[in-house]
């Protein structure tokens, strides 16, 4: 078997194995060393390829594809520093447990560590962030090479689904010439293989006594596409309030036991005595709720469908590695407890807080008012993707009367890659992106995917000319002299030119009334810039906090 035949057999087999374990989309960043796989993916009849010249943005775009399709997605790049640009998205995928398949092309072994161009040490280069990594052998025509691909793909497949989900990395060295025989498409298969299946039942004997206490809470974070119907059923039967993070997707159910205003209530001084807490899913966004969890004496139970339990903000008394539905189904035989008054107390606080927030939004002109207006425009067909820092916090506080789905990059919580991830989701969903100006600037090149692929997306860009969240931190008061340069970081950019560069329509709003009457587009790529003031935003938010503290004090 000559080199061309060996290369052809190897890359066609590898692509077929990826398909067999569920990969249907690949994001390719063009380069020479990745030629063999790029050509094969393009030739595969049942794998869709996306082309993005920027590796960092491409990797985040793939995360959006994963969120939108609920399937593993692969990324492919050439050798050298191109691969290093994947790191931020891989870190996000690891913490968010997204099945990202990282494929880095490499120089052959004889060109490593000898000063050859475009060659860095790529073996295990993402070891801190991936669940699996393997440096594949070079194509040599040996049957052992194909066996190795099959064995390692089977091992890696356990990380594409189920509780061990997360990123995997294959490093693939290729020797020149790099072109496989594309006439051998008969080697490409579209056969699916049996995927790992996880099914668990548990004993709840250890928490039976705790569950008989009256003052219980269920706190639900990002559920990452898990079914949640049993949480609502259990809450209804046992009269337990559910403090639901916007990423839990529970708020859109409009269930009477779902509490949405808890962040503002705890910020206002809420301090009800709680006997136990069942924490489900990822940690919540709310800093105030996390601070309360850290200091409370309540017995804490964590339920996560993953082998790596996220204990933040404080280790629990007991944890269960099981799906939320299976866990709450296991509790259904426990005796009923009288909790009507406990639940009604939370529902009363929620109702009063919503009234106060709604009244606030009628008169406010700050960023929260724009966010509130945007939420009212969304329907159950819409997906709201939210940037980090202030946008996600405003959504956390104001999302209580919408059927839209809500997503964000809340693994590593970075401001990078937000535009790209939202556009990846836009390939599968009707997406509106809410983002701040610094986060938008950080990932403007991600807009290229909308231009190249005619993706539909609405971008609401909140421009306060800097980092608005820092105004809420101690630096604002303790480092006044240096605050604006080090933390405010104004850029003074005119984003209308960005819209022009990437073929987005653009409209700027400097008053809330005009924005309220604006309609989100149903097709095409559109940017809506709203101009806000950081100091005014801080002042109006503080007024809302004061109003809610009065409610809490009167109620308690």
UniProtKB/Swiss-Prot annotation:
GO terms under biological process: menaquinone biosynthetic process
EC number per UniProt: 2.2.1.9
Essential cofactor(s): Mg(2+); Mn(2+); thiamine diphosphate
Pathway in which the depicted protein is active: Quinol/quinone metabolism; 1,4-dihydroxy-2-naphthoate biosynthesis; 1,4-dihydroxy-2-naphthoate from chorismate: step 2/7; Quinol/quinone metabolism; menaquinone biosynthesis
SUPFAM superfamilies (UniProt xref): Thiamin diphosphate-binding fold (THDP-binding) (SSF52518)
MF annotations from Gene Ontology: 2-succinyl-5-enolpyruvyl-6-hydroxy-3-cyclohexene-1-carboxylic-acid synthase activity; magnesium ion binding; manganese ion binding; thiamine pyrophosphate binding
Enzymatic reactions: isochorismate + 2-oxoglutarate + H(+) = 5-enolpyruvoyl-6-hydroxy-2-succinyl-cyclohex-3-ene-1-carboxylate + CO2
Note on cofactor: Binds 1 thiamine pyrophosphate per subunit.
Gene3D superfamilies, sorted: 3.40.50.970, TPP-binding domain
Stored InterPro entries: MenaQ_synth_MenD (IPR004433), MenD_middle (IPR032264), THDP-binding (IPR029061), Thiamin_PyroP_enz_TPP-bd_dom (IPR012001), TPP_enzyme_TPP-bd (IPR011766)
Keywords: Magnesium, Manganese, Menaquinone biosynthesis, Metal-binding, Thiamine pyrophosphate, Transferase
Disulfide bond sites: none
Family the entry assigns: Belongs to the TPP enzyme family. MenD subfamily.
Protein task: Catalyzes the thiamine diphosphate-dependent decarboxylation of 2-oxoglutarate and the subsequent addition of the resulting succinic semialdehyde-thiamine pyrophosphate anion to isochorismate to yield 2-succinyl-5-enolpyruvyl-6-hydroxy-3-cyclohexene-1-carboxylate (SEPHCHC).
NCBIfam families per the UniProt record, alphabetical: menD
Quaternary structure and partners: Homodimer.
Protein name (record): 2-succinyl-5-enolpyruvyl-6-hydroxy-3-cyclohexene-1-carboxylate synthase
UniProt source species: Staphylococcus epidermidis (strain ATCC 35984 / DSM 28319 / BCRC 17069 / CCUG 31568 / BM 3577 / RP62A)
Lineage of the species this protein comes from: Bacteria, Bacillati, Bacillota, Bacilli, Bacillales
Name of the encoding gene: menD
